[in-house]
Amino acid sequence: MWGSTCIPRKVYQGLYPLKRHFGCAQAQHFLVFCWLLMALIRDPGKGTLKGLKPYLPPTLKYWTTVRMIRSGQWDVEAVVCDLATATLRALPPPADGVLYLIGDSTVKEKRGRKHPLGRMTRHSEHDPYTFGFEVVLLIASWEHRRVPVALALIDPSCRGHQNILFRQMLTDFVPPSWARHVVVIADAGFAANATMRLITAKHYGYVFAMPRTRKFTNGKHLRDLVQHLPKSCSYRRASSKPDGRRQDYWVFVRHATLHKLGDVTMVLSKKRRNMGPKQVKIIVTNLTGATAGTILSIYARRWGVELTIKELKSGLHLGRMQVTNDKKCVTRSVALSVLAYLLLVRLYGADEAVMQDWSLFKLKEHFIGEVAQDAVQRTERKWQHKLKQFKDVA
């Protein structure tokens, strides 16, 4: 694969507002940062620092990129926040003014056992145990658009760190000016009491899956209702997926008062009428006047964060860089993939012809083509200038 010797003007201008976060001018960390994002987008391989060398200029050595990632002179959280804010402002707003904040966690498997944030874990009781580190991701979504706005790594030595990080993300997030209503969507792992109080205090709506251990005000658990609910109480309702396809569920709707949560609308849903209690999903919301189909359609948007995680892992090599055993260094290396995603959305998010299907891989193809075209045009201008000099001398 051919290399590049110059950062395209469009990329440099898109990242220039972040230059103030890179304090070490002597080491030119901002330029190294720009090159690393471009290399992550262009690299189809494993995404390691040594694997990115063919996509970097010959003068940029391996140890220069390592020192930049290890350096503590740039705040990765502030860089992600500023680039996400600029990206949200550059995209066209929805007609209804509703912004959805979707949170989820994922596990990045690692083979080495000395990872500073690694631990043995599994996705569910039916999956095998794997060793890796966990990442919490928060995205902003509306219509067909998905924009990562915050990222953090879970420390296994801190109890309840996942919900602590999620609350910090919600606290730090500043909605764009066009957002008239914000709805938070997450699964049962994020439904902590402190998180629900924070969402209520910020006057956000929420659509959460609830664990069966949650209690009513009379002391009974949700699992008691799910276990003994007759099939005759469920009725069929249609919902829509984010891509517009229809999905029918058998639902039971009830207005209830939950312990430490207050008055909510509770939806018990299952895909088939004859499914048992274990296949029932409990969804709770504070949206007043929302029908069962609307609640299910909103919760279906949670699939957007799953797609974003898949794109980050397969397309932008999330967590594949081999760095030291420093936790902050690992966080910086993981955040580079999210920053590369934001760069692509920042450059092409407003172009409806490119963003019609909202596919990261199509954005990568478009970016690689533009970088190649820019390199060819720059080489052509250089040789035309030299030819003109030869003619003037002759």
Where are the language model's segments positioned?
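Short amphipathic alpha-helical "interface-anchor" segments enriched in bulky aromatics
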Residues: 107, 295-323
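Basic, amphipathic alpha-helical segments enriched in Lys/Arg and hydrophobic/aromatic residues
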Residues: 318, 322-373
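Electropositive, glycine- and tryptophan-enriched low-complexity nucleic-acid-binding patches
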Residues: 63-67, 72-73, 123-181, 279-280
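Long, charge-rich low-complexity segments
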Residues: 79-88, 92-93, 97, 175, ...
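Extended, non-catalytic structural segments that build the interaction scaffolds
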Residues: 36, 280-303
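Active-site-proximal, Lys/Arg-enriched surface segment
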Residues: 39, 67-144
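Gly/serine-rich nucleotide phosphate-binding loop at the start of the catalytic core
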Residues: 1-77
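An internal, acidic/charged active-site-proximal segment
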Residues: 151-274, 356-361
